[in-house]
Amino acid sequence: MRLTALPAFADNYIWTLIADDGTAVVVDPGDAAPVLALADQGLRVDTILLTHHHDDHIGGVPALQARFPGVRVIAPVEERIPTATGRVGEGERVQALGRTFHVLSVPGHTRSHIAFHTAEHLFSGDSLFSLGCGRLFEGTPSQLLASMRKLGTLPAQLLLCCAHEYTVSNAVFARHVDPANAALWQRQEEALAMRRDDRSTLPVTLANEFDCNPFLRVHAAPIRASVSAHLGRDVVDDVDVMAGLRHWKDGFRA
């Protein structure tokens, strides 16, 4: 089994798991072209997994359905994804390529956002990024906190496969919030070196994210202190920290 991140648009990744026989699971194909280029070399798409309804994640589905009639399209319970052939929610499982993809409900970025994880990988869409998380378009800080806590219980060895190359820009904000975090400094330097060489900063272990990502560490004293200082008052609880942290990030300029 081979994991490939297909670049799309300015900074998207279309994650593709490819079996030895060329059969594939494709995650969030906002653009069909990168997948169709592999199809011209023999790739056969068996299953498409969709994390949420935004067009840069689902826009390529009709063209892939035309190329691969009968392909499964698994999506959240969401009326804004009309191309879905199956809909799943929290605790359900998808079987594909001999692997089990566990479904997690992770609202925040959108109200119906889901993630998929196997024994090796977490496909988080726009819920969790390396060193960051998705902007709140439809969800609440309380929902975002619950989603981050849920992702924070996953095995540390899982590889985070998120949908955007935001690591370097996220690192600047994370360092501003948590400047004494040595692991974060190291992750930033590694990410900068990777991007200078035009390499992806992903996947990355959840263990690294647990150490470095401020949105997974709202309970930690340094994060709480930074958010309190930014707000000019003591934070009340973890929801207050998450709300302040997300709002801070939304308006942050390095």
Curated annotation (Swiss-Prot):
GO terms for biological process: methylglyoxal catabolic process to D-lactate via S-lactoyl-glutathione. Binds 2 Zn(2+) ions per subunit. Pfam families: HAGH_C, Lactamase_B. One of its GO terms (molecular function) is hydroxyacylglutathione hydrolase activity. InterPro entries: Clx_II_MBL, Glyoxalase_II_hydrolase, HAGH_C, Hydroxyacylglutathione_Hdrlase, Metallo-B-lactamas, RibonucZ/Hydroxyglut_hydro. Keywords: Hydrolase, Metal-binding, Zinc. NCBIfam families: GSH_gloB. PANTHER family: HYDROXYACYLGLUTATHIONE HYDROLASE, HYDROXYACYLGLUTATHIONE HYDROLASE GLOB. This is Hydroxyacylglutathione hydrolase. The lineage of its organism: Bacteria, Pseudomonadati, Pseudomonadota, Gammaproteobacteria, Lysobacterales. The gene is gloB.
